[in-house]
């Protein structure tokens, strides 16, 4: 069980032709399905998507499917990839000194029962954050996503347990990832001390602003 972005990285790292991920993504369990990725680490696009579906539609029964390839050419993403991926992630920090000054930032994180639990707490600690708290009830692996109606981290309902914990421990920020950890949800306190959600567009703009501002300051 590993995050989708790690699989995308692994495809490029190992020079694979394609990648497969079984996930419901940020949807309820009924949407569990098959994500296919091409050699660039991105989801399959035209014309390859049509070619794949054309072959699928030729299958009349699951018993018709026979694997005749070399099993040694199939790489399961695991601890070996984790180490390489986390080391790569660590290098993309814009300004490590900022993290050192903010190492006590109190972070609440929830993977909503998904793959983020495998790497995100480790990545945060590897970057230098020393005050990371997870939501125990949602650190349990489960494809049923039993504590939420829908595991979309941009929905208030999915972040309710994390925000409750944040209020209890007086955290600075809440972070959540969807079950395959390619979507993030965040919450912070406004100037009245009320917890508010930051949607995906706002999060992206904040990241972009920070990156551009700091690269200019560093003359890059």
Where are the language model's segments positioned?
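Well-ordered alpha-helical segments embedded in enzymatic catalytic cores
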Residues: 6-7, 84-88, 158-161, 203, ...
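Proline/glycine-rich low-complexity loops and linkers
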Residues: 59-81, 190-220
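Gly/Ser/Thr-enriched, mixed-charge loops and adjacent short helices
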Residues: 32-158, 165
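N-terminal small/polar loop signature for handling phosphorylated ligands or for N-terminal nucleophile
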Residues: 1-31, 130-186
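Short, surface-exposed connector motifs at secondary-structure boundaries
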Residues: 98-106, 170, 215-220
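Short Gly/Thr/Asp-enriched flexible loops that form oxyanion-binding sites at enzyme active sites
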Residues: 31-38, 182-200
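Short glycine/threonine-rich loop-to-helix capping motif typified by GTGT followed
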Residues: 9-13, 115-122, 188-190
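Short, glycine-/Ser/Thr-/acidic-enriched flexible segments
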Residues: 2, 25-27, 41-42, 49, ...
């Amino acid at each position: 069980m590993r995050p989708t972005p790690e699989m995308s990285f692994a495809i490029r790292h190992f020079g694979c032709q394609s990648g497969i991920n079984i996930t419901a993504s940020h949807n309820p369990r009924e949407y569990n399905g098959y994500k296919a990725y091409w050699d660039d680490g991105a989801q399959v696009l035209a014309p390859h998507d049509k070619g794949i579906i054309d072959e699928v539609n030729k299958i009349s029964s699951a018993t018709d499917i026979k694997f005749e390839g070399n099993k040694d050419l199939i790489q399961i993403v695991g601890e070996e990839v984790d180490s390489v991926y986390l080391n790569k992630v660590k290098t993309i920090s814009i300004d490590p000194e900022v993290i050192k000054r903010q190492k006590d930032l109190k972070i609440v994180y929830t993977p909503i029962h998904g793959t983020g639990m495998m790497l995100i707490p480790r990545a945060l600690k590897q970057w230098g954050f020393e005050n990371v708290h997870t939501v125990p009830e949602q650190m349990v692996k489960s494809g049923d996503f039993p504590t939420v109606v829908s595991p979309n981290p941009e929905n208030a309902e999915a972040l309710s347990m994390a925000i409750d914990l944040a209020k209890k421990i007086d955290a600075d920020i809440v972070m959540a990832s969807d079950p395959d950890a390619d979507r993030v949800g965040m919450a912070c306190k406004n100037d009245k001390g009320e917890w508010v959600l930051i949607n995906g567009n706002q999060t992206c703009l904040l990241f972009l602003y920070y990156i551009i501002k700091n690269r200019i300051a560093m003359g890059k």
